[in-house]
Amino acid sequence: MVIGSGIGGAATTLLLAHAGVPVTLVEKNRRLGGSCSQYEKRGFRIDIGTHMFCRGASGPLGDVLRRVGKGGAIDFVRTRDISELRFPARRSSSASRAGADVLRIPVPSDLARMPQLAWQLARAIDMTPREATQAARLFTYILTMSDEEVAAWDHRTLEEFVAPFTDHAPTIGIFGFLLGLYFILPYWEVSAGEALWCFRRMAKDNSLSYPRGGSIAIPETYCRLAKELGAEVRVGVGVRRILLEDGAEVGRVRGVELADGTVLAANVVVSTSSLRTTVLHLVGPQHFPAAYVERAKRIRGSYIAVQAKIALDKKLISAGSIVGGVGEEVDLLNVTTSDIKEMFNAVTRGEVPPIVPFYCPVPSNFDETLAPPGHQLLTVCAVAPTSDVALRDPGPVWEEAMMRTVRRVVPGLDEHALFIDRFSVDFIEKWIGKEFGPAVSTGQTPDQVGARRPPVYTPIRGLYLAGCNAGARGVGTELAAASGMECADRILVDLGRELRAREPARLRVRAGQWASRVAQVPLAWATRARPAVVG
């Protein structure tokens, strides 16, 4: 029995079905997909969440399909400019002098155009040659580290890692902001090892993309393939609690009780909710060791976001997404370190931050069928606190701050908007079914990654975890897919099943990786800085 049809639950269901394990997936909502679900309105097909996929078919989302022999079942699409940094043009900037209201810095898909991005970004943040050299050393070092060097930074922060390389606040601000999109946490709270692991793989794969059909194409495809293999998938079926055998010395799962009181028997149950929700509400703390309960209570989730879905009658953006951070007097291009910290401190106080960071994928630029002909769909979000934080600024104020920010970087937005659907934190919390509504239920902080991350198994026999709650590494949905694979493997081992051999890496891929590593050695030797020794 798998509870929840998000990426983690859908992946686990498919892999167990492929292994011949009878499996039922239950989803409380009437549509599959969790935060990757979709709704339709006036010819637009709209994501519930706000998504792009860092490694596309090259990463865990594709690995799930390759494990079941369906590697090409989802079509991940890229655009010429995969993203674009946008800021209001400052009076002294070249964009302002050229008469433009917005400074645009394209992020290309083609690696050959990356030097142009570096040049434009360096000019935009007024880098001196010394500062540019420091930034180059930082990124060269990151890309040429060994896996062992990366793992040594698991339990220290990204702030500690960056400090020996540069103190240039705009460089730190933009790098920290982009990694903040990965983890929905400030960079001084993020595990350096986790951030480096994710950034290196994203850079080397160069597969940031979006699936044809929308985000729902991923869980929908997993579930369709699982059903073809005999799995049962039920929607509109909520789980009230997970049931245990009576009188067992060690807790053992016996099934679930649904919201309508129906009991479904199962000797294995996979929860894709948060560890906190699973322990305290679905099972009950009395059934777990005290130390495990305390750990579940202490788990730190990520922040969440307010969202808006904007339907336009005209195409206003050509890139695959736009990102940035905008304030009244300051933005990410001219911040100080204090500005960056105050941005997140305000969020923890329940106040709209002085700089509003935004992230806005444009799904219809990847798949034109997601909007009527000639139209465009924007899905924008801005960071917000989880529901356990008392709001000093009411929810609608957060939503309006997000919209005000987007209007400043998308000229003509209001004139061409057909409708704008706003999603509050409360809505997202109810939809995904995780207490407080964190985007990542076990946040990737130094004490919650690597060896210190909760495992996919629990002290109760037959109870497992999958999704962004336990196990694995990665960004968002890719973390969930990797966790799903880890969970399925653990279940099969515990059931005494043989794990199927992994498909070996193709010789050309291995040769390319080896050649890339060799080519990087001279550059690494010449440019790498020596950060503080990990103790």
Where are the language model's segments positioned?
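Active-site-proximal substrate-binding core of FAD-dependent oxidoreductases
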Residues: 244, 492-530
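Flavin-binding catalytic cores
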Residues: 315-316, 347-355, 390-431
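A glycine-rich dinucleotide-binding beta-alpha-beta segment and adjacent secondary-structure elements
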Residues: 173-185, 353-359, 411-473
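Mid-domain catalytic core of redox enzymes
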Residues: 240-371
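Helical element adjacent to the flavin cofactor pocket in flavoenzyme catalytic cores
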Residues: 198-259
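A conserved FAD-binding loop/helix module that cradles the flavin
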Residues: 50, 470-491
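Rossmann-like flavin
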Residues: 81, 85-191
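N-terminal glycine-rich phosphate/pyrophosphate-binding loop and immediately adjacent elements
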Residues: 1-127, 486
